[in-house]
A protein has these predicted regions:
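Flexible, small-/acidic-enriched active-site or ligand-binding loops
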Residues: 2-3, 7, 345-393
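Glycine-rich beta-alpha junction loops
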Residues: 46, 130-131, 203-208, 215, ...
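Short Gly/Pro-enriched turn/cap motifs at secondary-structure boundaries
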Residues: 63, 228-233, 238-239, 345-348, ...
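Oxidoreductase and adenylate-handling cofactor-binding alpha/beta cores
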Residues: 176-196, 209-221, 262-269
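Aromatic-enriched alpha-helical interface/lid elements that frame and gate functional surfaces
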Residues: 236-312, 316
Length: 400
């Protein structure tokens, strides 16, 4: 897909200036760009976003996903001239997105108050570890720390081991997602009132927001959830079970679904057993029930168990690896993974734009730009009227 492809999606009339780096802020920008917004990402000259060199394998590809559909320019935000350039970009934008430590933009003369004086309807999206206020606001914060503080890390892993982590930067993407939600709500508010505002999304609070009923469980019942491995305490059966040739996940914790599972297992009597007949009883006898199911699954192949679960309408599935996703007909039918042409790869595969929209579907028009400052001439020339000579001068002095 060429960079001149026409943007599609519900946000094609929105311009966002992205000042963030790495994951949390840029994930919000990625979602906006996927939905058609004109996202102009500002990177420091000479080095760029550190994510450009992050990744595994022979080539760092994280950048290609995170900065897809974005136009990338350089500006030295530590220099007054660089700040002035960015201020001019923001003056003509709908939104500005940043994920620096709280107070950084203020030190650069880019506070919301200063920017909104020139652009009263401006929406500022601020993503940070701890938020813009409070005693921890000035601390450096990464996803790992936010996941720990927000309570998620304590619940991850086996009960007899130290807390573990998910294999992804969940805190970052959660914060970016909530930031995007806040920004879209702020756009709606601006349409009705003309007012801009600040979105303050922290990593730890984004994690806290998905912690279900852990807070009231403790304050009302003095109950603290603990690590439980592949199961959830008192929710049964919902676990990963051994098969002859692999492992398989079964989630049959609702009463009617559990009855269907018992029929599939050829043991309908279990559904009327007092130990398992009701949700609460199954939770109290979770270990016994998991052992019974595991004894049954280990005598069958993964495909055999899957066929029985499908036949009886029991929610279940294989534990997919990346190759499994690429080979799966459902992924293919819904185009969940697509080929994106690039200069280096004719068919670079990556996850598509989600969610799907029946009227205003977004698309991947290009991947993260290869060259640092690739859109300097286009953006600074078209939007600010700078000439090639102006840009050459700014480049020679490390302003861009």
């Amino acid at each position: 897909m060429k960079e001149e492809s026409t943007a599609t999606g519900p946000l094609t009339d929105v311009r966002l200036i992205e000042l963030g780096q790495l994951i949390a802020g840029p994930f919000c920008g990625q979602m906006m760009a996927d939905m058609g917004a004109d996202v102009i990402k500002v990177e420091p000259p000479g080095t760029g976003d550190p994510l450009r060199v992050w990744g595994r394998g022979d080539y760092p590809l994280w950048w290609k996903v995170s900065s897809r559909n974005k136009r990338c320019v350089t500006a030295n935000l530590r220099e007054p001239e660089g700040q002035a350039l960015v201020r001019r970009l923001i003056a003509g934008a709908d939104m500005v997105l940043e994920n620096f430590r709280a107070g950084t933009l203020e030190r650069w003369g880019l506070s919301y108050e200063e920017l909104a004086a020139e652009n009263p309807g401006l929406i500022m999206i601020r993503v940070s570890g701890y938020g813009q206020t409070g005693p921890y606001s000035s601390r450096a914060g990464y996803a790992a720390v936010g996941e720990a503080m927000g309570g998620m890390r304590y619940l991850c892993g086996e009960p007899d081991r130290q807390p573990s982590r998910a294999g992804l930067s969940v805190g970052d993407t959660l914060a970016g997602t909530f930031a995007c939600m806040g920004a879209l709500a702020a756009l709606h508010h601006r349409e009705r009132t003309g007012e801009g505002q600040v979105i303050d999304a922290s990593i730890y609070e984004s994690v806290l927001n998905i912690m279900e009923a852990t807070i009231p469980e403790y304050t009302v019942s003095n109950y603290i959830r603990e690590r439980s491995g592949s199961s959830l305490p008192n929710v049964a059966p919902s676990n990963i079970y051994d098969c002859k040739d692999g492992i398989f996940l079964i989630a049959a914790n609702q009463d009617t679904v559990f009855r269907r599972l018992c029929t599939a297992m050829g043991k309908p009597e279990l559904a009327d057993d007092d130990r398992f007949a009701k949700h609460t009883a199954r939770g109290e006898n979770q270990a016994i029930l998991d052992a019974l199911i595991n004894d049954w699954t280990r005598e069958k192949s993964v495909n055999e168990v899957e066929a029985l679960m499908l036949e009886h309408g029991v929610p279940a599935g294989k534990i997919f690896t990346t190759p499994d996703m690429l080979d799966d007909p459902h992924f293919q039918a819904r185009e969940a993974i697509v080929d994106v042409p690039t200069d280096k790869w004719p068919d670079l595969k990556m996850q598509n734009v989600f969610p799907k929209m029946s009227k205003t579907q977004g698309q991947i028009r290009w991947t993260g730009p290869e060259e640092l400052g690739e859109h300097n001439e286009e953006v600074y020339g078209d939007l600010l009227g700078l000439t090639p000579e102006d840009l050459a001068d700014l480049h020679s002095r490390n302003i861009i």
